[in-house]
């Protein structure tokens, strides 16, 4: 055990003894401990949890963050650093066993007294045989009423199955199917939070969600696609989007299958800022884009996603369609550096995500990718080898030069000139200030084409 963490635990244990109140580590802390996974979130429960939290936060000189101040259900958090925080929750019921009976799944319904944990005694309190389910890699609900008490648990079952790589026990899956519509009672921001965690897993359990029919409740458009067929094969309209989702998931796991020169760079990109999850979300709602009246931004706002996340999904969908359109010909498209540069400039932060989604669409639709692969690699190579390094160097020309030397004022042409000069610099057409000024003077009187 980390010496710093042990010191924290000793202090908390001492406070609980002073208050004559037993304190336990519970839930995900015990699950991760038994799985030998790194623990960043320590969950405590005690009848005196609020007072222990207040006194300990004061002792370690950290802010006490209230997560829930409902009388009898108080939860407080103390953040020690970005990778370590302690949560203190009031014991539910008179005993730890009563508390555990109110938790969601057997693997989360275990506890150990803090003194035993400190002394590394494996005296696990496990009334629902969670240790057996951990060993057998099974998600099992503690009691059926768990889904009625908090319908978000319907989705959490799949989140844990996805993040841990576990199966959902048959009866639990059946109960989810029975209670599936109750997910509509849950605030959309809570649903979005769980969906992001689920989709952020390397293998999101879409097939299990389909079996329970929860997927169709969360995304009603999928239910419509499942009932519509494509003649003459009779295949449902959902089969294509589902294949695209699976191909995207596979591509994110193994980009070296087709994009070997850039595989490690891509893995680094998708690991940041929820890109992994948001890309999969893009694939899930892509079928809706076929409806000309569909407003992706408004649709995503219903989930209370951040504006940044909404823009990422919207622009990924938009620019992936451009990639598919531009590479539709036998030649593959994007052959000229100028074309590549302009697409990179327009797509911005969503360049890579749009390329990956477009690739998944081609794979999912079982289209010929012989010419598509070189096109995507050509764009990635230009972006990584030329465009990104060029962004680290200052522009040859700025607005001050246009104002001072050419007597221009900020206007659409002003922006047009700066963009064209920057394009020429990145493409290697010009290298010096003199060349930049010469090009600017030519652009002042040339026809103007504003970029999007």
Residue ranges and their predicted role:
Residues 1-452:
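Catalytic cores of the polymerase beta-like nucleotidyltransferase superfamily
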